Amino acid sequence: MKTATITTDINIGPFKIPSNGQNMIMNNYAERNNLIVEAVIPEPMMSNALATVQWLHNNKRFKKVILCSIHQLPIEQDRIENLIKNMEDVEFHFALEGICGRGRKFLLECIKEANMFMKAKTIDSTQNSWLELHKMMKDKLK
């Protein structure tokens, strides 16, 4: 079984994780889940198309790939369709979310969750104390 980790740009959704940090996160995930990483694939900076891994998949036939987060998946519809078409049979693991799965439905659900998260309103925690943030949370639950 061929398993690969994929590093991408430092900007991963709401996170900023340099490639060495991404490698540490994915290697830790692989170790905890008894996965043996056989390839490390760096994607180009400023790209979330995952084109390099798709190109290599044509020759290497990966069974599993590990990414840090669902936020590394493509956003543009044509890139999403290319990824699904080329890698629908591959098992995707997302280390930060702790989820894995394969197929069109799984990937589309991950992309939907990432999009929903990115549209969520953020609270400027520098303008509020922890007590104010806690009160805001409790008020929302009422």
PLM features per residue range, with description:
Residues 1-142:
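Short, structured surface patches at the beginning of a domain
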